[in-house]
């Protein structure tokens, strides 16, 4: 249905989800009606589906890697339109599930947290599920997807074929791709995996919602509040049992229990004294990225015998991309995630100050007082974007739109 494709394209453009290249490719795919052939291929249960490519990408701010999957471009376009249309099933999810939903997400979670009376006086449990997407049990997931059979047997059949292939392509040293047999779970990185992730724990979400328990889930991050320590332990035991029943594992290093009045973190934010700011971990992780990039560019500048401003400009360009562009394999944009939801600029000021130190280091190769001869105005001329200024610029724009 071309009208659906046109609506999908407009939706993506309005939300600035597409680069110029991506928009051009999608327009071409629609105008040439390549979706007609692909629709027939996906409906043909006798046709073997393309295999996804398995890749490892850096896990922000650490030496760890995370595994993502991606299908060939045209197959990926088909999965994107399917993901877009899956929003018709949004009503099956509880209101305490905030991930990957249209016009409902992290800002609503933060608003609920901020407007819940007495939340600072409650006990809090933060739980993270280890390798959530790729460790999802496919047979359990297919059972949970069975509600699709009533109205869309073909869609269920396609998902069954996607999920049970247990095979992927991996690039080897000489540039070739080899087949590997493996359990892929919901395949993090493919367009429909967020829907699978929401479905997989929807019964757990519904359990806590039905009982009026203050519970928040965003994908693999879960936050629960209780009035007493004993009550929190009861909720914890129930949650852990449900996680085990789904054959998932908790990440023990990321479990956090907070008593009333203590600061707690969720989704990269921290809540302290009624204010929402960048979490300490978010700040540390970003500083680590800045330091590594500055040192790498300084080494490159010296090796090439270039002037210091070349390294500084390279660093600024990299940071602008990090803060204001989409993250690889996702539609995540750092500034769009954090700026609308924080209520103080304290964390941004800390990052700005550190970023300016790194820019000056790129020029001189040292961290010392003499670096201040490199003026703020000079950094602006090189393209530096002050985070605090960008934050308030966004607030002004938002107020005008109201």
Model feature map: region roles:
Residues 1-37, 366-376, 380, 392-402:
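Non-catalytic, polymerase-adjacent accessory regions of viral genome-replication enzymes
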Residues 76, 80, 177-181, 206, ...:
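Right-hand nucleic-acid polymerase module
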Residues 39-63, 157-176:
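Reverse-transcriptase-like RNA-dependent polymerase core
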Residues 78-137, 379:
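Active-site-proximal segment of RNA-dependent polymerases
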Residues 116-219, 223-242, 248, 258, ...:
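Conserved polymerase palm-domain catalytic core
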Residues 63-94, 181-209:
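Conserved pre-motif C helix in the palm subdomain of viral-like polymerases
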Residues 50-52, 217-220, 253:
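Short Gly/Ser/Thr- and Asp/Glu-enriched loop/turn motifs at secondary-structure junctions
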